[in-house]
């Protein structure tokens, strides 16, 4: 997301979390220090630095090198999960997961988010995987990794910008209370992470066929 919209959205999400009675803790690495609970100034610094190319993109693989260099870094889903789990944070929200890229049979391009979901005990609330990915293969790989994907108020997994992917949700939760029970049981059994897949509002969503045409045209 371009600056300054990235900063505006991050602060708006924090405000929404507070309004719901929870405590937000935006995660990143600032001057080599992994930080769970960035200040508004630190969010501004990382948001602006991303546009300037001075902020590193950090998955699990990249965090130690960023710390050693005392550099700034914005965490991917996998990086955020790692730091959240280390701090005892059990739930985080993001737009969408990384997963299996289109053409992965040749490129082997699969996001580090998938193995991290199997490893770190964090519930990731999102609109499933990003639309540019191969969504059926992503769903299949998550199944192989033993990662539950819970459709929140839907029997069909969302597709980031779209409420519909054509992929059946492996399990569903009708409301937050039901989702919380699934999360609690999963963590009690020490089974790693899981995904709570929340579709975008239908009035704001985009038809998946339109998204696919745009992606195919760009590839």
Residues covered by each model-derived region:
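Active-site cofactor/substrate anionic-group-binding motifs, chiefly glycine-
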Residues: 2-78
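A glycine- and small-aliphatic-rich helix-loop capping segment at beta-alpha/alpha-beta transitions
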Residues: 3-11, 42-48, 98-118, 141
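Solvent-exposed alpha-helices and their adjacent loops that cap or buttress functional pockets
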Residues: 18-19, 82-86, 91-93, 109, ...
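General beta-strand structural signal in soluble alpha/beta enzymes
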Residues: 24-29, 73-76, 91-96, 102, ...
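Glycine-rich beta-alpha junction loops
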Residues: 31-33, 98, 153-158, 198-204
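Active-site glycine-rich loop that binds ribose-phosphate moieties when present
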Residues: 76-77, 105-118, 122-143, 175-181
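Anionic-ligand binding region
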Residues: 163-187
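A C-terminal functional module that forms or caps the active site or interfaces directly
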Residues: 195-197, 201-219
């Amino acid at each position: 997301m371009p600056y300054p919209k990235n900063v505006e959205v991050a602060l708006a999400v924090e405000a929404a979390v507070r309004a719901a009675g929870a405590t937000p803790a935006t995660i990143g690495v600032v001057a080599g220090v992994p930080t769970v609970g960035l200040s508004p100034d630190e969010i501004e610094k990382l948001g602006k630095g991303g546009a300037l190319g001075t902020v590193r993109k950090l998955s699990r693989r990249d965090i130690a090198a960023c710390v050693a260099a005392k550099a700034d870094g914005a965490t991917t889903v996998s990086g955020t999960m790692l730091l959240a789990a280390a701090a005892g944070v059990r739930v985080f929200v993001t737009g969408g997961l990384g997963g299996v890229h289109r053409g992965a049979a040749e490129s082997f391009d699969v996001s580090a988010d998938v193995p991290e979901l199997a490893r770190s005990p964090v519930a990731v609330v999102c609109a499933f995987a990003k639309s540019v990915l191969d969504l059926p293969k992503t769903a299949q790989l998550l199944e192989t990794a033993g990662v539950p994907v819970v459709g929140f108020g839907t029997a069909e997994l969302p597709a980031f910008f779209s409420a519909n992917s054509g992929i059946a949700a492996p399990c569903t939760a009708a409301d937050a209370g039901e989702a919380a029970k699934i999360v609690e049981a999963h963590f009690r059994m020490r089974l790693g992470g899981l995904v709570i897949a929340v579709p975008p509002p239908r009035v704001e969503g985009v038809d998946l066929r339109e998204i696919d045409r745009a992606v195919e045209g760009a590839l």
